[in-house]
Amino acid sequence: MKPFAAAFTASMMCCTSALADVPSLAVDANIVFLGEVHDNPNHHETQADWIAALQPAALVFEMIAPDVASGLSAADRADSETLGKALGWAGSGWPDFAMYAPLFSSAPNARIYGAAVPRSMARQILSDGLSVAMTLEDRQRFGLERDLPAAQQAAREAHQMAAHCDALPEDLMPGMVLIQRVRDAWLAQQALAALQDTGGPVVVITGNGHARRDWGAPAAIAQADTTVAVYALGQSEDGAAQSGAFDHVVDAPAAERPDPCAAFK
């Protein structure tokens, strides 16, 4: 087990010039989104470097439920093994916690917030509507009460179909897009709450799709509060164009992974 204090010290020793490598717009932002391809360790190394440089007052994670994050104690964050167990990471379905642990240790004093939409709630949204996820006030605040423009709805449905290897029925796509919009709104809600609670800056750890400025959580924040300065970093693989609008995109080698569509064949 590696104490987080030692990990933080090592991180700062290796990254004393890291702030110079972070764009000034990110340094000055209230909320910084750090996108990722979830299983790419290179992307998590970049995130850890940016977090070490920015030293945010709060970290918001797509992967953690709000109640789990709020229940973390200082003892839970004593080392990576203890933290992983406190988060219930092993049974969460997310990639190896070893890739995510440095994100916590790079800012050991940051408050942790969670924005994960429970799977049970996602299913309930499809059957019972958005009221199970947010109040009417918040749905209006983050734009969930408005239909998307037709072109954006079609693009989002195509994106979801491609992400699922063109293997799912088309009539499921509108519901999947709706769930993604709810996840964007939850990320935005938690990021704004973290900013209000701590004064910022706030760093949000999430997939590239939720970090994009044009229709991800940054767009939901812009709907809610135009005075909040947001910066969005996307991360690509092997030089491939990254879908969506970002303030900056960092490229890295692709992670070694099996064919994600093999299960559908």
Regions found by a protein language model. Name each.
Residues 72-194:
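A substrate-binding/cap region within the structured catalytic cores of diverse enzymes
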Residues 4-30:
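N- or domain-start disorder-to-order transition segments that initiate the globular core
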Residues 59-65, 231-235:
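Short internal beta-strands
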